[in-house]
Swiss-Prot record:
InterPro entries documented for this protein: PSI_Ycf4_assembly (IPR003359)
Name the UniProt record assigns to this protein: Photosystem I assembly protein Ycf4
Disulfide partners: none
Family of the protein in this entry: Belongs to the Ycf4 family.
GO annotation terms (biological process): photosynthesis
Major localization listed first in the record, in broad terms: plastid
Organism of this sequence: Cycas taitungensis
Length: 184
C-alpha cells in the first residue's frame, strides 16, 4: 500500500517477509529435521520419530546420506529464517516533488552495507522503463533511467505483477514524475 499526496509519493517495499517464504522455510526445516532424525535413528538403532520405523534403514549408506541431506537442509532453512528475521530487501521508494529528490532505501544483510540508500535529483530521471519478457517464466520489471547512471530496478522480479498492473504502475509513476515510459 503506497502513500501519495500532491507533492510526495512513498511506496513501501515488501522484503523477504512474505507468506511464501514462511511456508518454504517451515517445509524445509521440518523436512530436513525429519531426514536428520531418521539418519540418526538408523545409527542408534532406535526410533526417534515414533511414526517412522528406521530399523529397515541401514546406517551405511542410507543413514549417512539422510543425515547429510538433513544437515544441508537445516543450513538452508536457517539461511531462509535469517533473511526473514532481518527482513532483507524491504524498504521504501520516496519521490519528493517539493524538494526535487528521489530516495530509494533497502535493508540488506547485517554488516557494513546493511542499509542501501540512494538519492537522485528528479531532474536527472530521464524515463521509466518496462522490461517485459513473456513465456514459460515471464519477467516483468520496472526500471528508472537516470542520466549518467545505470538503470535502477523499481519493481522486483518476484513481485509477479500482471501486465496491466505493471503498465498502470508505470503510467502513474511517469505521470507523477512528468517523464516518458519506454518499453523493451
Amino acid at each position: 500500500m503506497n502513500w501519495r499526496s500532491e507533492w510526495l509519493w512513498i511506496e513501501p517495499i515488501t522484503g523477504s517477509r512474505r507468506t511464501s517464504n514462511f511456508c518454504r522455510a517451515c517445509i524445509l526445516f521440518f523436512g530436513s529435521l525429519g531426514f536428520f532424525l531418521v539418519g540418526i535413528s538408523s545409527y542408534l538403532g532406535k526410533n526417534l520419530i515414533p511414526v517412522l520405523s528406521s530399523q529397515q534403514i541401514l546406517f551405511v549408506p542410507q543413514g549417512i546420506v539422510m543425515c547429510f541431506y538433513g544437515i544441508a537442509g537445516l543450513f538452508i532453512s536457517s539461511y531462509l529464517w535469517c533473511t526473514i528475521l532481518w527482513n532483507v530487501g524491504s524498504g521504501y521508494d520516496k519521490f519528493d516533488e517539493e524538494e526535487g529528490i528521489v530516495c530509494l532505501f533497502r535493508w540488506g544483510f547485517p554488516g557494513r552495507n546493511r542499509r542501501t540508500f540512494l538519492r537522485f535529483l528528479m531532474k536527472d530521471i530521464q524515463a521509466i522503463k518496462m522490461e517485459v519478457q513473456e513465456g514459460l517464466y515471464p519477467r516483468r520489471v520496472l526500471y528508472m533511467e537516470i542520466k549518467g547512471q545505470r538503470d535502477i530496478p523499481l519493481a522486483r522480479t518476484g513481485e509477479n505483477l500482471t501486465l496491466r498492473e505493471m503498465e498502470q504502475k508505470a503510467a502513474e509513476l511517469a505521470r507523477f514524475l512528468r517523464i516518458s515510459i519506454e518499453v523493451f
